Amino acid sequence: ADAIVIGARIIGTAVALALSKAGRKTIGVDRAPKAGYGSTSSSCAIIRVHYSTLEGTAFAFDAYHDWEHWSEYLGPNVLANLEVARFHETGALVMKTEGNGHLKNVVENVRALSIPFEEWGEEQITQRLPGYDLRCFAPAKRMEDPAFGEPGAGRIAEGVFFPTAGYINDPQLASQNIQVAAEAVGC
């Protein structure tokens, strides 16, 4: 083997597939009985393109296109008789807060990479998401705190909407889809 990939979760199976597609003889190993067990199977499967570093943002946006075109990513003849994970592109609204630097760095990153985003004010947030509570609940409180769930001072005034965000319906199944694709190209 040219490479041994340890871990058959979403990252490990994707690495094995990429190496196999590049012509490397690859072996994937995991102590679990199936791909996608472990932390991947318990993840919330959020797909997002907004990160604090330019490199992380670029990597995530590249991966977004794989999720968007899942069958092409997996390769020809992989989908026959196979249940396939689905990407639900819902978009994501991230609030600008003091704690996240009002997303200044994140907005710079997505702007530099021409990733779609919209900056929303309070009026647009409540128009697009009726019933959204814009009271500030920071700082975080432990559940044992009598003030848990009570608003703090101030309001959220702005957010950034990323239309390319969403979620995968089944992260374990997504790992298993990639495993099948990797096996189809010789892993």
What are these regions (language model features)?
Residues 1-11, 27:
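Beta1/beta-strand and adjacent pyrophosphate-binding region of the FAD-binding site
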